[in-house]
UniProtKB/Swiss-Prot annotation:
Keyword Transferase: yes
Native source organism of the sequence: Bacillus cereus (strain ZK / E33L)
Family listed: Belongs to the thymidylate synthase family. Bacterial-type ThyA subfamily.
Any single GO BP term: dTTP biosynthetic process
Descriptive protein name: Thymidylate synthase
Amino acid sequence: MKHAENEYLNLCRHVMEHGTKKEDRTGTGTVSVFGYQMRFDLSKGFPLLTTKRVPFRLVASELLWFMKGDTNIRYLLQHNNNIWNEWAFKSWVESDEYTGPDMTDFGLRSQQDEEFKVQYDKQMELFKKNVLEDDDFSNKYGYLGDVYGKQWRAWKTTAGETLDQLKDVIEMIKKTPDSRRLIVSAWNPEDVPSMALPPCHTLFQFYVADGKLSCQLYQRSGDIFLGIPFNIASYSLLTHLIAHECGLEVGEFVHTIGDAHIYTNHFEQVEKQLAREPRPFPKLTLNPDVKSVFDFEMEDLTIEGYDPHPAIKAPVAV
């Protein structure tokens, strides 16, 4: 039987073989395709990729952060999650208050210049310490703008009210499961210019059939090697959590990507991953005593039977 991970591996192959060379915002360069879809049957295992280690702890803590409506990296740092650091750090080193060494283009320079990387690492550690320990600094520079959590939980209306999209969609799933309006959007055009990173995973929709909850994500932009493995696991986890509260089984996670791209400095890593054979997907177990999705904490989420190939490191394009 075909392993479900081939959905992702086939995406990698397709883009490597048929992708168009494009320039990008980060200056790194990519090959990309437009419009690609993958499907994962969540009843047959939790799609945490096995051809390289994907850290479930980071996936889960980021999702819980989104669900809390938080937009400050302090919560993530408190959970030893550094995946958003670079975007907050960028706003700090570009501010008038920053007086340290020049950090222009720190993403590329830290990959190419060992001497600069030492300076960068030192400044990043100081930045993280300040976010964790200084409330005023954290409020100003740990804040990422009105990113995912704010849009999910407190979308501002023109009337000055706030909409809790995530809470509302859960109630709709319970009361009107056949609705075609089971949608949450993170793309708020008015807020996009002030966000540290405009939403890559833009909009998701739920679908209930035969007692099963499915989810489709539309992702405007997908970093295939680093980002998409996280997105697959994150929205699969979200589907499990909401199905749990609503008394449903899990169905499919459908992942639709607009610009699906591989950065040119990830080619070697992708080839290494493609040479590996997938292993069985793990099982996700949720604490049955937790009834609301908003009450889950890290200790309530357990992954069992995860035996991946080793991690493959790659630089992040900022």
